[in-house]
Amino acid sequence: MRTSGSRLFTSESVTEGHPDKICDAISDSILDALLAEDPRSRVAVETLVTTGQVHVAGEVTTSAYADIPRIVREKVLEIGYDSSAKGFDGNSCGVNIAIGAQSPDIAQGVDTSHEARVGGTDDEIAKQGAGDQGLMFGYATTDTPELMPLPIALAHRLSRKLTEVRKTGVLPYLRPDGKTQVTIEYDGDRPVRLDTVVISTQHAADIDLDNLLAPDIREKVVDAVLADLDLPSPLDTSDIRLLVNPTGKFVLGGPMGDAGLTGRKIIVDTYGGMARHGGGAFSGKDPSKVDRSAAYAMRWVAKNVVAAGLSERVEVQVAYAIGKAAPVGLFVETFGTEKVDPARIAAAITEVFDLRPGAIIRDLDLLRPIYAPTAAYGHFGRTDIDLPWEHTDRADKLRAAAGL
């Protein structure tokens, strides 16, 4: 039962077999292959999937070679689309490629920053300009041990579990495409009750929804995930509304059901709508693109602020001008949960973190093939893989800089 001061907040996730996530995975797999051979590769790869077809386009400047058709087919098969009975088959789908070089007009601003052109510098970090203008946000909260909002964290866990029970054969009749949605009741800033879970999963034909699928999803997915929850404060899960495939059957899925595109799940990729978003997608982009690298840096900053005890919730924004190394703006929002003056937090961030693109790439060691695993189940708050922007290695320095 909701209390008078409560509110409901909802976030969604999708499985790796969702058409848009197939595209993200292909784009990031191509990126990783290029970075593995040439860490200085400039990559902007977009993917489209539709019935029986994969289209890869974009701009790449590199000394590396990537066998793109092979990468595409291997990724599609790894996800689980290996038969026409599933609506898509990595063995036989068409693969079309249209890739050119990065624009020299963009490259000049990344290779030689505005600061270097105007003032001259021997500082290699200062020489690298931002690959585009834009604004990026980072967020952290004490909802979960990984300092993520609970709705998106739980939605991702459910999506990962859907894939796990499919791939391990626990529920062999499941198919790769699927979505999850979680509604949490908050009392103020504290999550107190799980209100609704929606799970839509592709399945084999002739599966009984009420007598097989729904009970299996409750036991093998929802109950299993909830049993593993370890939260800072109690969460009431005693009266969950569970909706499994509320449209009925879900046999036709994947690229046959819907066309997919890289970069169409940016809220799923980040904070599930709990924080603002600058609009830039991640997958298929090398770290010279601040859409990706600066968003990772902002998560790193936000997580360290909360881990340092400076605020229970924080959202940080950074902004860049194309070709300029130094950010043009930094904003800190603490939602009234700060333990010190927000101005001191902002000053501490500026002292402890170098937010120039070259410094972000250096400090987070981003010129590595680490991106394909981020293409599904979120780029932030991951507990299943080690990501450098999830480290709280600067919390002590932040505390000291803020005077704690």
Swiss-Prot record:
Record-linked Pfam families: S-AdoMet_synt_C, S-AdoMet_synt_M, S-AdoMet_synt_N
Name of the molecule in the record: S-adenosylmethionine synthase
Family in the record: Belongs to the AdoMet synthase family.
Binding site for Mg(2+): D20
Biological or metabolic pathway of the protein: Amino-acid biosynthesis; S-adenosyl-L-methionine biosynthesis; S-adenosyl-L-methionine from L-methionine: step 1/1
Region listing for Flexible loop, in residue ranges: 102-112
Biological role: Catalyzes the formation of S-adenosylmethionine (AdoMet) from methionine and ATP. The overall synthetic reaction is composed of two sequential steps, AdoMet formation and the subsequent tripolyphosphate hydrolysis which occurs prior to release of AdoMet from the enzyme.
Broad class of enzyme this protein falls into: transferase
Binding site for L-methionine: E59, Q102, D258, K289
Cofactor note as given: Binds 2 divalent ions per subunit. Binds 1 potassium ion per subunit.
Chief subcellular location: cytoplasm
A Gene Ontology biological process term: one-carbon metabolic process
